[in-house]
Amino acid sequence: MTVSTCATQLPVVTSTLLENAPVAKGIWKLRLGSAEIASNFVPGQFVMLRIADRTDPLIGRALAIYSADAKVGTQRSWIELVYQVKGRMTTQLAELVSGQRLELWGPLGNAFSDKVVEHLVMVAGGIGQTPFLT
């Protein structure tokens, strides 16, 4: 008998770009309409992202969820992702405008523990600090 601990299928969610704006030199924030992901997100998780209808780059990129607002029962739920413009994919992301479509799968990854501890040390640098801001 085998026990599977992995999902057999991870649905892809097509999301609409609501906002794409620079927040610092070379750092951008995406706001995407996504009720499915916003309502299931737990701080510390990420999504895989691809630009819809493009095959270059073929492989999606992992981006930490910066913020989310799940407005239950409405179409106004969103998630925010922060990224650094560094390569081909992020350069293409920075050129996107509101209304364009992206493909997401997630939320993925282990969320932060909510266990109360006496001492906690968290270390992050650069764009890697995004999940700590949620």
What is the predicted function of each stretch?
Residues 2-98:
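Ferredoxin-reductase
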Residues 88-134:
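FNR/FR-type flavoprotein reductase catalytic core
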